[in-house]
């Protein structure tokens, strides 16, 4: 057997072994979380954001991408908004796109399975990282379980799936980066490029927080490797340049793959308020969180004992409990020789100080003023980095214990016993974060087609997209219902809102508001009788009213009486545009009650026509006399450059890999 055949056989064995490891992670994940699959009694889609954001937005994403059309604009919520601009929609996350292509329009069951695949990826990535750090196969699996089966990571899956998905890329980023740094030319190693791709995916998954904290941890890890992997005989300057150039490669690759998201979100946030549930919303590009908000969701000093009691009063998954089994193993891990334990302890201490926020003086004051960290609204969200460090120590501790057992079968038996006890503890103390499939707050129950929804659908079919529904309170119909059912709502559930739309509604929130007339709020769902409205029907205690003064979404400016049939004809709604036929005996201004936003274009009878931008709220255009076809389309400037950046990033990664193969031969 020649050297080439030996190399091929060796590679084949490694690939086969790693595929088996990945399948084992998948199997263990599905066994541990079996209640989400069979028999399906629990679901991850029970938290408010998962039910009312993640589920309907995945519907919108699937509907558009399955038609090979990027989901650029959402007509169904508020007066329309740029769908990718609100980055929690994860409109350009490749895994979501591939999944809906393969499985179709998502159901709660399908999304639970997608979340489980990410759990398995987290476990596998953690195992790879730990094995790279010298931990054996079975303890590395245990470390992967500690990282994601309980604690801040698992809790986030039930509350905000898009944040959870971003968290799981942390071990992958560090694993790829360490492998890249071991290459001869770290800055052009394909492993370093993959670290940049993994970091980019943590942003594309739908939230900036994992990207910020993953980047922070990568920086800490790079400094650690600078000292641990320093090449003897080389100056500090050369070693520093080696690490810095690798980080630069990661940054460039990450930028190329996230550019499309960053560009769309920057354009949107420049025109939006953030945290609209607050009494005084802030401009979305105000990246530093107000101090009173920053100190609202943090750990308290008594919460520190949750490491063994499991009880914490902190919101947002602010717990230190990762089971007694893992705690004992982590204590053993502190006895493992080497510098990693000191690095893990140092990072853990830093993370706890940040999570305590205003409860520590003066560090809380200092942490609030640290760049990047003060961009995250809830300091406790950084605790998954504590969980990561804890998991590495637990895996090292189990490794040390297994090293004392000479028989291979004995080591495997102890591993099975330890991970089984850990799984029982995690199920007992972590399963309460799941929601029962019978809960009215789950996506299964919240988006059932009720008689009220059916009635509103029928009204919408009579005038497609011409009027909107207002619910008071807004949860009387599921927020973002328009992404699932054919209807449009005045309000949705998002953390931000376009300033022009917010300011328009804020003029008068009463049901007789002229602002509601302007946005086309014709139907009102309420739980209390309302004077001055036309009663239509009642549905299970909910009252449906009609607002006769509501203007249609398409109308003639300044003349409500001329919006009848024969003047504005059939409206054909498309995924990122709308076409309509109109007829008028003189030139008139046609108003489209959709928010005036960059990227909209109009053609009248095939001729490009300027949009009147004097009115900041809605769009209008002057149409000539006679019969005309008006075509509105949303084509943002950043789409083509963003796709080109994706392509360029893929080309660079491919070139890196081919270069490595040539050097090897």
Task: Report each predicted region and the residues it spans.
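Periplasmic/ER-lumenal interhelical loops and adjacent helix-loop junctions
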Residues: 51-69, 81, 250-333, 375, ...
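Membrane-interface helix-loop-helix junctions at transmembrane boundaries of multi-pass membrane enzymes
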Residues: 14, 230-245, 329-362, 408-409, ...
């Amino acid at each position: 057997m020649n050297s080439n055949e030996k190399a091929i056989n060796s590679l084949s064995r490694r690939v086969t072994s790693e595929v088996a490891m990945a399948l084992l992670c998948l199997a263990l994940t599905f066994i541990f979380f079996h209640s989400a699959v069979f028999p399906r009694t629990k679901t991850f889609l029970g938290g408010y954001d998962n039910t009312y954001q993640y589920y309907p937005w995945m519907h919108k994403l699937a509907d558009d991408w399955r038609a090979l059309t990027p989901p650029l604009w959402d007509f169904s919520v508020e007066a329309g908004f740029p769908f990718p601009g609100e980055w929690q929609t994860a409109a350009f996350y490749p895994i979501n796109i591939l999944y809906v292509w393969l499985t179709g329009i998502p159901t709660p069951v399908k999304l639970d399975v997608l979340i489980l695949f990410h759990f398995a990826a987290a476990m596998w990535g953690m195992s790879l990282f730990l094995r790279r750090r010298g931990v054996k196969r079975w303890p590395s699996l245990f470390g992967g379980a500690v990282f994601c089966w309980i604690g801040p990571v698992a809790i986030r899956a039930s509350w905000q799936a898009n944040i959870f998905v971003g968290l799981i890329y942390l071990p992958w980023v560090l694993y790829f980066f360490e492998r890249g740094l071991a290459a001869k030319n770290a800055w052009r190693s394909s492993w370093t490029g993959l670290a940049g791709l993994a970091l980019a995916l943590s942003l594309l998954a739908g939230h900036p927080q994992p990207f910020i904290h993953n980047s922070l941890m990568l920086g800490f890890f790079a400094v650690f490797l600078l000292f641990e992997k320093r090449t003897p005989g080389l100056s500090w300057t050369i070693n520093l340049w080696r690490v810095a150039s690798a980080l630069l490669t990661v940054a460039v690759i990450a930028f190329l793959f996230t550019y499309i998201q960053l560009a769309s979100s920057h354009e949107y946030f420049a025109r939006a308020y953030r945290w609209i549930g607050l009494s005084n919303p802030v401009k979305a590009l105000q990246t530093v969180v107000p101090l009173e908000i920053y100190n609202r969701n943090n750990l308290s000093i008594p919460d520190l004992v949750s490491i063994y009691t499991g009880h914490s009063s902190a919101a947002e998954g602010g717990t230190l409990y990762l089971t007694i089994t893992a705690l004992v193993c982590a204590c053993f891990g502190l006895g493992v020789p080497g510098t990693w334990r000191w690095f893990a302890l140092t990072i853990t201490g830093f993370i706890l100080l940040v999570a305590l926020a205003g409860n520590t003086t003066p560090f809380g004051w200092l942490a609030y003023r640290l760049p990047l960290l003060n961009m995250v609204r809830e300091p406790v969200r950084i605790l998954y980095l504590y969980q990561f460090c804890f998991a590495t120590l637990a895996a090292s501790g189990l490794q040390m214990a297994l090293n004392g057992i000479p028989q291979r079968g004995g080591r495997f038996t102890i591993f099975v016993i330890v991970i089984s006890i850990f799984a029982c503890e995690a199920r007992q103390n972590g399963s309460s974060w799941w929601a029962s499939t019978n809960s009215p707050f789950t996506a299964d129950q919240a988006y059932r087609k009720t008689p009220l929804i059916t009635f509103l659908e029928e009204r919408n079919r009579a005038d497609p997209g011409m009027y909107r529904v207002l619910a008071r309170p807004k949860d009387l119909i599921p927020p973002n219902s328009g992404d699932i059912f054919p209807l449009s709502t005045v309000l949705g559930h998002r953390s931000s809102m376009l300033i022009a739309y917010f300011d328009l509604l804020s003029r008068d929130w009463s049901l007789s508001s002229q602002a509601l007339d302007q946005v086309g709020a014709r139907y009102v769902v309420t739980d209390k009788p309302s004077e001055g409205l036309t009663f239509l029907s009642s549905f299970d205690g909910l009252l449906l009213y009609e607002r006769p003064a509501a203007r249609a979404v398409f109308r003639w400016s300044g003349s409500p009486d001329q919006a009848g049939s024969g003047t504005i004809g059939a409206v054909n709604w498309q995924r990122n545009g709308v076409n309509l036929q109109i007829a008028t005996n003189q030139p008139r201004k046609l108003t489209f009650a959709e928010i005036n936003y960059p990227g909209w274009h109009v053609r009248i009878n095939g001729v490009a026509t300027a949009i009147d931008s004097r009115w900041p709220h809605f769009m209008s255009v002057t149409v000539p006399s006679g019969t005309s076809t008006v075509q509105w389309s949303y084509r943002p400037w950043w789409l083509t450059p963003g796709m080109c950046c994706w392509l360029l990033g893929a080309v660079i990664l491919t070139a890196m890999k081919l270069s490595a193969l040539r050097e090897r031969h």
